[in-house]
Regions:
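Short, glycine-/aromatic-enriched active-site segment of Class I SAM-dependent methyltransferases
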Residues: 133-149
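Short alpha-helix
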Residues: 149-172, 176
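Class I SAM-dependent methyltransferase Rossmann-like catalytic core
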Residues: 1-33
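C-terminal lobe and adjacent flexible extensions of AdoMet/dcAdoMet transferase-like proteins
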Residues: 194-238
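A short acidic, Gly/Pro-enriched loop at the edge of an enzyme's catalytic core
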Residues: 84-99
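Class I SAM-dependent methyltransferase SAM/SAH-binding core
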Residues: 26, 34-88
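Conserved catalytic loop of SAM-dependent methyltransferase domains
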Residues: 170-195, 203-205
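A short glycine-rich, Lys/Arg-flanked "PGG" loop and its adjoining helix->strand segment in the class I
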Residues: 112-127
């Protein structure tokens, strides 16, 4: 599948994209919020969610998988970015306390390898957070948004995939209950619609925000015996 950066940028610059970020950020804040100093890796396209400073401050490194797109690196005083090979991350084993993944799992053709590589760089009992399109939603069936142009997952599918790759204690929350249209009335009342949708259609939100914990004794299956690093390994330890 294709990682279309232009489509993502255009969507998140639209009114629909902006209210989508607001709804997703409310869930992210719960999973990323911590008073502890932690190493957190952002993987995929997570730039829209960094506009909220309290979320951006939790993430100290952005890792953007290599594509045919010309990617403009994102830099500010809080985050640094690097383009990487999705199956051979240039980080040490057990490097990060948390990994936050957005707009990649649903477009990658090498799911097992990607997840096992993210498992490798997580510390013991580390947490991984995904934003994943929900297959039982209107959003995944309309192509005017990035969640409708990729491979969606059901709650049971993503749980099974993560279990097989060495993750447990999987928590799933839903958001984006308002329909994916740029109507002024909808945009104005998106919070009300979101609350009604959550109450009436709990498992039908457009996006799943998922947190899973690394299972220390599991060894994810890899289809390759070894990987060649195309960048020097990066350590975040001072």
């Amino acid at each position: 599948m294709n990682f279309n950066l232009k489509d993502l940028i255009e969507f998140y610059d639209s009114e629909l994209g902006k209210i989508s970020v607001i709804s997703i950020q409310e869930k992210l804040h719960r999973f990323l919020d911590t008073k502890l100093k932690q190493n957190v890796l952002g993987f995929g396209y997570i730039i829209p969610y960094l506009r909220k400073k309290d979320i951006a401050s939790k993430i100290n490194f952005l890792s953007i998988p290599s594509t045919n797109n010309k990617i403009k690196y994102y830099r500010n005083e809080l985050n640094a970015s690097l383009e990487v090979d999705e199956t051979s991350l240039p980080f040490n084993d057990l490097e990060f306390d948390k990994v936050f993944v957005s707009h990649w799992l649903e477009v990658s053709d090498r799911l097992d390898l990607v997840i096992s590589e993210l498992w490798r760089v997580l510390k013991g009992q580390g947490k991984i957070i995904f934003i994943i399109p929900n297959s039982f939603s209107l959003w995944s069936n309309i192509e005017n948004n990035p969640f409708g142009k990729c491979r969606p997952f059901s709650k049971s599918q993503i749980k099974k995939l993560l279990n097989l790759q060495g993750f447990e204690e999987i928590k799933v929350e839903f958001c984006l209950y308002f329909p994916p249209y740029n109507y002024k009335l909808l945009v104005k009342n998106h919070k009300l619609i979101e609350n009604i949708g959550r109450a009436l259609f709990r498992n039908m939100g457009g996006v799943m925000v998922i947190e899973a914990t690394k299972f220390n004794y599991a060894i994810p299956k890899k289809q390759l015996k070894a990987y060649r690093y195309i960048f020097p390994k990066v350590s975040l330890q001072q």
